[in-house]
Amino acid sequence: MKDLPADLRPREKLLARGPAALADAELLALLLRTGLKGQGVLQLAQALLDRFGGLSGLLATDTAELGSVKGLGPAKRAELAAVLEIARRSLASRLAQTPVFDSPQAVKDYLQLQLASKPHEVFAVLFLDTQHRLLAFEELFRGTLNQASVYPREVVKRALALNAAAAILAHNHPSGVAEPSRADEALTQALKAALALVDVRVLDHFVVARGSVVSFAERGLL
């Protein structure tokens, strides 16, 4: 980046004008620090954003998948993984301190970071207290998810163990399409009925794909 005028270099620009003044590629370039032969660091940063669908897509990408990208060695992959974990922990802390419906976008962002990059289907639950603050996020089932593979009694058991008052269901679609299926709707109703028996309310069910999250509640499917 030394070939750029001083006031256009990302680091100098950040120090002079603050991080909000930087484009996504410029922020990423600060993490990457160096580019490749024939490809400057800003070009590499933009190529990564284009490939993975922006910053949210990049942060939701599995570390192993990043290993296939030319120019991302172990050190750079470790730094990106650290940023991802910081984002996860920051969102989890926020959800633990405030009711989830005070920050619905934070819930979606958190689920993107947790589930979007999974190469297989994962069913997870956010267990909430009486104030709808996060008690725990748990991945409970993996594989092809349907009423036969997701056991309501196991979800109920965890809710009771955590003394949860409410729950948000979530699962991913590795296909990249976040549209709920009929099987997803049937599973939701089965879990909703099972949890109601122990006075645990299902507040929502999110379907997560890279770059998008669909809410059952917003669709009127709950």
Swiss-Prot record:
One of its GO terms (molecular function) is metal ion binding. It comes from the Bacteria. Residues 100-222 form the MPN domain. The keyword Zinc applies. It holds the Pfam family UPF0758_N. Signal peptide: none annotated. A motif (JAMM motif) lies at residues 171-184. Zn(2+) binds at H171, H173, D184. Belongs to the UPF0758 family. This is UPF0758 protein Mpe_A2695. It comes from Methylibium petroleiphilum (strain ATCC BAA-1232 / LMG 22953 / PM1).
